[in-house]
């Protein structure tokens, strides 16, 4: 299929720049994946679509305040560093701006010396392998010095950094939030659990590649970025049991769906305890083996994420739903409204 087939007109003013005061006050567009029927609801109405014996699968990754501002020791020049992926020990793959100022052996100081970095290797496109030195616990130092790496389409500063974390975020490692989960509060999760719905966690650390535009014409030629995922034995067993007894598996976010489908795709549809790196690309024609329904946000035109949701329903239904969302003034992208495809 052509990437152009997944385009739609989106007025810029519908891109949500700030989160709503109440996480659960978002709207919820409900799409019947087979018939294409659309209903306009509120996010708390998700309760009526979840039943006893179903599984709600959420990604418990935690966004790192991964954007750092420092100075080049040799000249005092301002350097911006974005943490991308942890390597061995205290070494990280990073994106440095301006990259030309930091060559192999160059050093950077952050926050009055609380954190220092040495460049071990130069990569293409501004990438650098930096080794960090610090006292104490790295993630605590990051919390003090780092900023949230908000998506490029968010132009406003975030007043409360916790609003770019889910309420159940636990496992450090993401460069971006699994945004479908931002709509949940602890109270709503408790109400869902009280209905007899099993709440199950997976981990997938979201990389910045999630914002990278698709730069090929044909979807068959697209190469996905890879992201780390993990599923525990307990979680795998619980999901398998729910599927065996006829319950629905409802994934919260495209990251949860990619984790489950990665594992199911090479275990004959079953889920097993597993961790690794996935570059699964789900687009129309894909046969889902683990997931029945999806709670997600409204995605960018021509993105791999709109291709994924088109695979769960079909391209015609999804584009009709997205055009409806534009007409009804839904809020789009990370801080926007939600969609339930079932």
UniProtKB/Swiss-Prot annotation:
One of its GO terms (molecular function) is S-adenosylmethionine:tRNA ribosyltransferase-isomerase activity. Its main location: cytoplasm. It is found in: Cytoplasm. GO terms for cellular component: cytoplasm. GO terms for biological process: queuosine biosynthetic process; tRNA wobble guanine modification. Keywords: Cytoplasm, Queuosine biosynthesis, S-adenosyl-L-methionine, Transferase. Signal peptide: none annotated. InterPro entries: QueA, QueA_dom1, QueA_dom2, QueA_sf. Transfers and isomerizes the ribose moiety from AdoMet to the 7-aminomethyl group of 7-deazaguanine (preQ1-tRNA) to give epoxyqueuosine (oQ-tRNA). Monomer. NCBIfam families: PRK00147.1 (NF001140), queA (TIGR00113). HAMAP family: QueA. This is S-adenosylmethionine:tRNA ribosyltransferase-isomerase. It comes from Listeria welshimeri serovar 6b (strain ATCC 35897 / DSM 20650 / CCUG 15529 / CIP 8149 / NCTC 11857 / SLCC 5334 / V8).
